[in-house]
Design a protein with these regions (language model features):
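Acidic/His/Gly-enriched intrinsically disordered linker/tail segments
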Residues: 1-82
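Gly-Asp-aromatic-enriched flexible segments
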Residues: 77-209
Length: 209
C-alpha cells in the first residue's frame, strides 16, 4: 500500500497503478472505518490546505492495508465494502473458567468480532442460536443448507494475519490452533451478502476439563 500512496505519482503512469489507486480510494470512501476522514482529506487537498494520507491515517495504516488486501481478494460484482468492513472497536478478552461470552452475528455482514481472545490449545464450547437467510427463499440455522452455504464459520486474527477459515456450525467445540481473536460470519459468497437476512446469537465458554 505504501507504493500506492507515495508522493510524486501522476495520472497516466500505467493502468495497473491507476486501478490500484482507484481501488484504495473506493475502499476509503465507502468503508465506515475511514470514510469521514477520507472526505475531509479530499476537501483539504483540493483547497490547498496542509494535509496528507500519512497525516490522516497514520494510526490506521496497518488496518487499512489489511482491509485493502482483503478487498482485492474478494472484489466482484455485488461486493459491498460497507457490509464487509472490519470491527476494530470491539475489545477482545480471554475467558476465565466461569466466564460466558455472547454476541450477535449478522448474516448480512462479513467477518464480525466475537470479543474472544483465544489461548493457543484451549478448547471452547459454542452454540449459535437462531435462523438466517442467505437468499429470500432459503432460511437455515448455523449449520447451513447442507452444501456449505449459510454455515457459521470462524477465523483467527493475530497481528493482522488471518488463519484459514474453519467451520463452526450450530453447536460444538473448537480448539484454538493459535493465540488470536475469533471472528465469525455466515458463509456466503462475498458478492451475495446484500440479500441476506437474520442473525444468530453465538454463545462461547471455555470447555470444562
Amino acid at each position: 500500500m505504501n507504493k500506492i500512496v507515495a508522493e510524486g505519482q501522476i495520472t497516466g503512469d500505467s493502468w495497473q497503478s491507476y486501478a490500484s489507486r482507484w481501488a484504495l480510494c473506493y475502499l476509503l470512501a465507502h468503508n465506515p472505518n475511514y470514510a469521514a476522514r477520507f472526505k475531509t482529506l479530499g476537501v483539504n487537498l483540493m483547497t490547498g490546505q496542509t494535509d496528507s494520507f500519512e497525516t490522516a491515517y497514520a494510526e490506521q495504516a496497518e488496518q487499512i492495508s489489511f482491509e485493502y488486501d482483503l478487498f482485492l481478494q474478494n472484489l466482484g460484482n455485488g461486493y459491498r465494502v460497507d457490509l464487509c468492513c472490519w470491527d476494530w472497536q470491539t475489545k477482545a478478552k480471554e475467558l476465565a473458567a466461569e466466564d460466558r461470552l455472547d454476541c450477535i452475528v449478522k448474516a448480512k455482514a462479513g467477518w464480525q468480532a466475537t470479543g474472544l481472545q483465544a489461548e493457543a490449545g484451549q478448547a471452547y464450547d459454542f452454540a449459535g442460536l437462531g435462523q438466517w437467510k442467505i437468499d429470500p427463499q432459503t432460511e437455515v440455522n448455523a449449520d447451513g443448507d447442507g452444501v456449505g452455504q449459510g454455515t457459521l464459520v470462524g477465523v483467527w486474527l493475530s497481528g493482522y494475519q488471518l488463519s484459514k477459515p474453519f467451520e463452526l456450525g450450530a453447536q460444538g467445540k473448537i480448539v484454538a490452533t493459535q493465540k488470536g481473536q475469533l471472528f465469525v460470519r455466515c458463509r456466503d459468497a462475498w458478492t451475495n451478502l446484500e440479500d441476506n437476512q437474520g442473525q444468530v446469537r453465538l454463545h462461547l465458554r471455555k470447555s470444562k476439563k
